[in-house]
Structure formats: C-alpha cells, structure tokens
Amino acid sequence: EFEKFEDDSVFDDAVKRGSYILAYSKTVVKKVCEKAQPRKIDGKSILVVNASHWMSEIGSRLSPDCDFAVMWYWDHEAKETKVSLRAFHEAVDVSEIAKRFGGGGHKKAAGFQLPRGKHIEDIFDKPKVSQKKASTRKKKGTT
C-alpha cells in the first residue's frame, strides 16, 4: 500500500486537489468577511459575522482591522448560539470577554454559548441616545 506514495503522479494529484480546496476556502472566507458588521463590546470595536465554518481563518482575516472579531452561528443540534472570538492585537484578551458569558479560552482565541432566549445582539453595547436627540424626539411627538 505504501508503494502508491512512491508514485509521483499520486502526490502531484493530491497537491493539485489541495490547491483547489485552498482556493475555494479562501474565496469563501473572503465573501464571509465582506459581510462583517461593526459593533462594540465594552467600548471595544469589533467586527461580527455569522459563520459556522473556518472560524480561525475568518477571525485571522478580520481581527487586524478591529479590537477583536466575533463569529457566531446557531447550532441546530445543541439548540444554542455558539460564539467564537479572535484577537490579533496584544492589548486585547478575548478569554476575559468569553468568561463574562460563561465561556473560556486563550488570550487570542476564546468562545462561549449564549443561554437560551438570548440573541447575539444582546452581547453588544447598546447605542447611546444623546439627551438632545431624546428631547427633540419628545417635542416632535407632543406636537
């Protein structure tokens, strides 16, 4: 059985197939990253995207452009939202963020599951409405 590995054509075919797989995965990762949306967690800028595969590759591509990247997906079997965090910059420790949500990991890669009833948007900072905008809305609504 090992003799087939001595045949260069078998090796060349494997390299050729591997290059197709690599090109495909790079294309998918690029397209997923183009859909990333900016949000904030604890005032830190993040890019978030729905993705169930290639988390490391997506996180590696997104994280240099923000404080850290968030990839999430709904796990149909477990019936829960799974969240993966990736950081590039030294100043960020995503394991601390993950711990706040009951998860864990390492400084540059961590994750957690959202409890039932929680949505991914629940983990992000809420936009602040300035008093001026709030009073303007109130005045418009009363006239």
What are these regions (language model features)?
Residues 1-36:
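Hydrophobic, aromatic-enriched interface-forming segments
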Residues 26-143:
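Gly/His-enriched, cation/cofactor- and phosphate-binding structural elements
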